[in-house]
């Protein structure tokens, strides 16, 4: 059996450092959401890009079209860059694509800070979306491909924590500057966007490229060096390299090259691609994006006292859920958490929010109730849906097609986010339908349908190595059999005598 002393966090400290640097990417993504969502409720910003509206709670408003484009162009840019991620990853690698994202982020921010015209602002939002698409896609790929199976779930929980923590920091910065009467109200938050990409750009110089990507390129010596850097001192990295190489070679036996259409030509790869796409879309299906993107504006128009402070409370609630989830992940399967505790609860809270506002709209008491319910909803979403959807989506693709599959899945996930952020202003803006919190009526059935999909189609791969997951998909197991299936003499090895990339498979609890 493997030496437990080689499989501790302390033994893997260099891998934790590398992944700790990379998770600054989702922090940047969350920071952008937190900052931009609050700008649209700042008088200092609305004096430039909005119009005076005495009938609204803050005395200012922004047109539905501008509101749509400012928020949704970022997700549109993320959709575009994620769609093309497979092509970039095939030649450039994970780190190089993240370096490109840092540069795009800096250029976009220069444009947004120096203009007072709407069109350059749109261009800046699109460019920063391109950067965010790379940040989210390639940081996930790097973590999936470098972390040992035992800690993959932990790293992805940290990934989601950093996204939420970034959002919280963004909302706190907005709250601190919101009452400034001039352009500094939003220029200070925008200036903060430079910090993370600058640090990330320099820090990535000191960590290795993904070993799986290097091996996929045939650069075995470089892959071995990367594994030696990432793994404990006495780990059997030669064995791990051979396992990765054998798994890749086995997949490539049926194809002479790799292209985007390969995701759908083979029934096994088609299944894995659709599962990855479906897992990412769970976030959009929960309806969370309109609250995340417009929470300060949403609270302001619902006449909530101090909407920026309440946005901080909402972000903090989501962050607490992520921390609590890190203790849950060890005990419960992802499928159960996603199904029972995530989608169903989130859908019910969306329905309760809508009904509560429908019965007594516009009162301060209703506003306080909405904040409390929104916090509970965000805890359910962050702790149970967001924590697992990206994780599962990254585990589903085959190693040969991982860049293409996850890139397309991320792109469609961003497309879903774009659709919500683009259409939400029609529903919540007083100058349009003015539904406000009634928007929750749409998301209750969406959550229930998503929960049904998870129950019937999404397999449980908790504790499995990427090579073991490949073997189970190749055997065409039904989703319900993944949890209890025992692998003997297949990719990934047996349950005993695991290498450094393998992990004990916990005894599966019954559904």
Report the location of each language-model feature.
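Alpha-helical transmembrane bundle of multi-pass membrane proteins
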Residues: 1-232, 249-511
């Amino acid at each position: 059996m493997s030496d437990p002393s080689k499989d501790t966090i302390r033994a893997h400290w260099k891998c934790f450092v590398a992944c700790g640097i990379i998770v600054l990417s989702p922090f940047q993504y969350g920071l952008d959401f937190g900052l931009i969502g609050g700008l649209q409720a700042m008088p200092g910003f609305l004096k430039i890009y909005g119009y005076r509206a005495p009938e609204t709670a803050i005395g200012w408003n922004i047109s539905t079209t501008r509101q749509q484009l400012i928020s949704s162009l970022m997700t549109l840019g993320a959709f575009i860059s994620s769609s093309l991620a497979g092509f970039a990853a095939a030649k450039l690698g994970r780190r190089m694509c993240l370096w490109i994202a840092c540069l795009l982020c800096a250029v976009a921010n220069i444009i947004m800070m120096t203009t007072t015209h709407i069109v350059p602002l749109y261009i800046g939002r699109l460019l920063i979306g391109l950067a965010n698409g790379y940040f989210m896609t390639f940081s996930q790929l790097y973590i999936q491909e470098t972390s040992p199976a035992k800690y993959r779930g932990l790293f992805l929980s940290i990934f989601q924590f950093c996204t939420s923590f970034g959002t919280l920091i963004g909302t706190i910065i907005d709250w601190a500057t919101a009452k400034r009467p001039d352009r500094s109200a939003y220029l200070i938050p925008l200036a903060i966007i430079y910090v993370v990409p600058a640090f990330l750009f320099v820090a990535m110089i000191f960590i290795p490229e993904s070993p799986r990507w290097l091996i996929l390129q045939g650069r075995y010596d470089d892959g071995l060096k990367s594994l030696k850097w990432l793994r404990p001192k006495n780990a059997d990295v030669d064995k791990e390299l051979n396992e990765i190489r054998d798994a890749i070679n086995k997949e490539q036996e049926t194809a002479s090259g790799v292209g985007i259409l390969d995701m759908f030509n083979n029934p096994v790869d088609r299944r894995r691609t659709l599962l990855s796409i479906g897992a990412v879309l769970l976030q959009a299906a929960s309806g969370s994006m309109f609250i995340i993107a417009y929470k300060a504006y949403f609270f302001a128009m619902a006449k909530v006292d101090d909407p920026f402070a309440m946005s901080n409370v909402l972000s903090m609630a989501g962050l607490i859920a992520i921390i609590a989830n890190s203790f849950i992940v060890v005990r419960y399967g992802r499928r159960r958490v996603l199904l029972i505790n995530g989608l169903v609860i989130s859908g019910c809270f969306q329905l309760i929010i809508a009904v509560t506002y429908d019965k007594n709209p516009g009162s301060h008491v209703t506003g306080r109730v909405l904040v409390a319910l929104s916090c509970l909803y965000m805890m359910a979403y962050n702790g149970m849906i967001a924590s697992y959807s990206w994780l599962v989506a990254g585990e589903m693709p085959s190693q040969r097609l991982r860049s293409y599959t996850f890139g397309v899945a991320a792109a469609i996930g961003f497309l879903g986010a774009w659709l919500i952020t683009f259409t939400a202003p029609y529903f919540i803006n007083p100058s349009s339908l003015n539904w406000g919190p009634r928007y929750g009526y749409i998301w209750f059935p969406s959550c229930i349908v998503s929960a049904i999909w998870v129950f019937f189609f999404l397999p449980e791969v908790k504790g499995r190595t990427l090579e073991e997951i490949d073997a189970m998909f190749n055997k065409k197991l039904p989703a319900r059999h993944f949890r209890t299936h025992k692998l003997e003499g297949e990719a990934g090895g047996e349950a005993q005598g695991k290498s450094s990339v393998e992990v004990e498979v916990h005894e599966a609890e019954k559904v």
